[in-house]
Amino acid sequence: MKYILTLLILCIACTSHDKAAQRAPESAKTRVGSSAESSVQAEKRSDKAVSLSPDEQQTWRKRLPLPAKCPNYDPDPSDPDSFGARVLMLNEKQTVVDARCMLGSYQPSHLVFLWDGTAAKPLTFPVYQTKPPAKTPSRSDVGELWGLTEFDAAAKQLKVFSKFRQDGDCGWSAVYSFPDGVVKVDEFHLKSDCDGNDAMNPQHWPAVQVQ
């Protein structure tokens, strides 16, 4: 009888050990998965442009040689597209600053500067448009950007979507980068015909061969 009881106790102990061994890899896998997920989330957070408080935005604006037509702008905290200034850090010494200027009827204007730690330099941007009777787009360099802007911190780029009318079925969109602090056009799309098609989808518009 004692022999049978001893065998039963040994069997129960072996069964408990096996179940614990089976759970251990699952727990380790869960920990590894959680760690990997945290790394991905951290990477995504690091890709986002620097978020500035309203006070920080005003501090940046005071560093810029803004003209009188660009009044002091108080952003609406509830509107992510409302801002006084945004920054894109290119490196330890250079920062691109996007300052909201005039509001406009359906899209605002922006002045963009390169800050080197001591002074701000106004930047100009190549824009391509078709001017009748010409049928091919021609380039002009503008210092004031009308439209919606967005920084891509991971790619160190500025994205612009400029509408010719409120419907957004015509206009242009561009992606700019800043190698060595110089403005470069990486991508440009233009749609001159306001025909109601492809509204708010500038990525579907004809691409322009940039110079």
Show the residue positions of the predicted features.
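Positively charged n-region of N-terminal signal peptides that target proteins for export
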Residues: 1-4
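C-terminal motif of bacterial Sec signal peptides marking the signal peptidase cleavage site
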Residues: 11-13
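Sequence contexts marking disulfide-bonded cysteines in secreted/extracellular proteins
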Residues: 15, 69-71, 100-102, 169-171, ...
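Terminal domain-start segments
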Residues: 15-94, 205-211
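Surface-exposed loop/turn elements that mediate protein-protein interactions on large endomembrane-trafficking
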Residues: 70-71, 114-128, 177
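Acidic/hydrophobic-patterned starts of short beta strands in beta-sheet-rich repeat architectures
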Residues: 90-100, 152-161
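Structural motif
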Residues: 105-113, 168-175
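Short aromatic loop motif centered on NTY/YTY
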Residues: 124-211
